[in-house]
Design a protein with these regions (language model features):
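Short aromatic/basic micro-patch
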Residues: 18, 49-52, 93, 131
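Residues at the C-termini of beta-strands that transition into short coil/loop
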Residues: 52-53, 95, 133, 148-151
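Active-site neighborhoods of divalent-metal-dependent phosphate/nucleic-acid chemistry enzymes
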Residues: 2-13, 60-66, 85-132, 157-158
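A generic structural signal for short hydrophobic patches within well-formed alpha-helices
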Residues: 24, 55-58, 99, 137
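A general structural signal for well-ordered alpha-helical segments in protein cores
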Residues: 33, 55, 77-80, 95, ...
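Short, well-structured N-terminal submotif of metal-dependent ribonuclease cores
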Residues: 1-50, 64-80, 151-158
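Active-site regions of enzymes building and remodeling cell-envelope glycoconjugates
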Residues: 141-146
Length: 158
């Protein structure tokens, strides 16, 4: 398309990470994966980001539990509120730029799911997605890392 504007996302110079729902949720387990715990402890607090979609995925889980396990749902809701407060400056919304990139990724990968929105968020902000589900992101071209296989004392990736 001659004369069409090429979409560019802003780029940062330092390695920052975007946690997916599974990695964030690991933090609240009674017996979390020690590799994940070690990895998260090794990261600078201001290098860890969440997608607003992660908040939505957790909220969906809370809603599913409300009729099945109301006390558990209440615990999750309280935990989610704490995560929102802790990560408030680091929760990334879906912007028009991210939505456009997501649209391109949908065609490229043949998948219209939330993982592509998370990948688009990471690509636009030059973040590495930290997830257990590496294969869900491979076709997007985003950098991914799985901390679940790390030994307890491990810490860095990238």
């Amino acid at each position: 398309m001659a004369g069409a504007k090429r979409f560019e996302c802003p780029r940062r110079r330092f390695l920052m990470i975007l946690l997916d729902t599974m990695v964030l949720s690991e933090r609240r387990k009674a017996k979390p994966n020690l590799g994940v715990v070690s990895y998260l402890k090794s990261q600078a607090p201001d290098s860890i980001y969440l997608s607003a979609l992660t908040i939505g995925e957790i909220e969906a889980g809370i809603e599913k539990q409300r009729s099945l396990a109301p006390e558990f749902a209440a615990e999750l809701a309280q935990w989610l509120t704490l995560m929102e407060l802790q990560f408030a400056p680091f929760i990334l919304p879906v912007t028009p730029a991210i939505a456009k990139l997501w649209g391109r990724l949908c065609v490229q990968t043949g998948n219209k799911g939330i993982d592509n929105l998370i990948a688009a968020t990471a690509l636009c902000h030059n973040l590495m997605v930290v997830t257990r589900n590496v294969t869900d992101f491979e076709s997007t071209g985003v950098r991914v890392f799985d901390p679940f296989g790390l030994p307890e004392a491990a810490g860095t990736a990238g």
